[in-house]
Amino acid sequence: MVSFSKNKVLSAAVFASVLLLDNNNSAFNNNLCSKNAKGLNLNKRLLHETQAHVDDAHHAHHVADAHHAHHAHHAADAHHAHHAADAHHAHHAADAHHAHHAADAHHAHHAADAHHAHHAADAHHAHHAADAHHAHHAADAHHAHHAADAHHAHHAAYAHHAHHASDAHHAADAHHAAYAHHAHHAADAHHAADAHHAAYAHHAHHAADAHHAADAHHATDAHHAHHAADAHHATDAHHAADAHHAADAHHATDAHHAADAHHATDAHHAADAHHAADAHHATDSHHAHHAADAHHAAAHHATDAHHAAAHHATDAHHAAAHHEAATHCLRH
């Protein structure tokens, strides 16, 4: 009986020890889970706060002097941007692929929304433009460096290798000014904001010093335009994209009052156009050279790209959707 009682006491002691150990483990696990949950919630909150302004910017460094470059809608998914917001290795430009000082153009030189545009924003290999892959001095670009002095730049996303989209005052609210290749020097674009679909210009050169080039609706897909610079108030160009009859204007630079030219296409040397603003469908000009000092030289109903921008508008309009999709789970 004594031996049996000792066994009962021993069993009870073992059971109590196991129960205590189990309780301690439960308390430890609960505490650990609580800490993990708090840490996870903190991480989620920090991630949410971070992505409010720099969505999916991998290694973005120094978005310098970008005043209100936050609230850039869809300026996301930039990788290794240096001195730029939410861009992939863009050097001084936002979301332009190797654009040099140009906006939304492929190798455009000093022109906006051209393929190979030089000095334009939102172009592939654009130098000094915003919204470019490897853009220099612009925000929301792949390898963008120094998107400086971009005041209120909105939606200047998706340019590859753009360089120096500097001094773009109010380049904000550029709706879908993306996907220009090798644009160069879209610098000194004052109020190049609210350019709706200013994408896809090929080889435009020097769309620099475009004062108030803002509100250009669909000013995209200009191929090999050279020196569309010094366009003062080239704003409110509705469907200046993808050459709604302003196609084939190579070097449509410095055209004074080439604005409101409806279907002014295939103009050679349309330079010195002051107030080229409100040019309805003055886009997609291919290799036009120096329609200089054409005061209101608007060609009515010229051919080559009546709404050819549709496929570009498709490509440019909300092209950031997949980036939103990619970051949707992270945001929530």
UniProtKB/Swiss-Prot annotation:
InterPro entries: Plasmodium_HRP
Basic and acidic residues bias (residue ranges): 74-151, 164-176, 185-197, 206-326
Signal peptide positions (record): 1-21
Ranges of compositional bias, category Basic residues: 152-163
Region described as Disordered: spans on this chain: 62-332
Pfam families: Plasmodium_HRP
Keyword terms: Malaria, Repeat, Signal
Name of the protein: Histidine-rich protein PFHRP-II
Natural source organism: Plasmodium falciparum
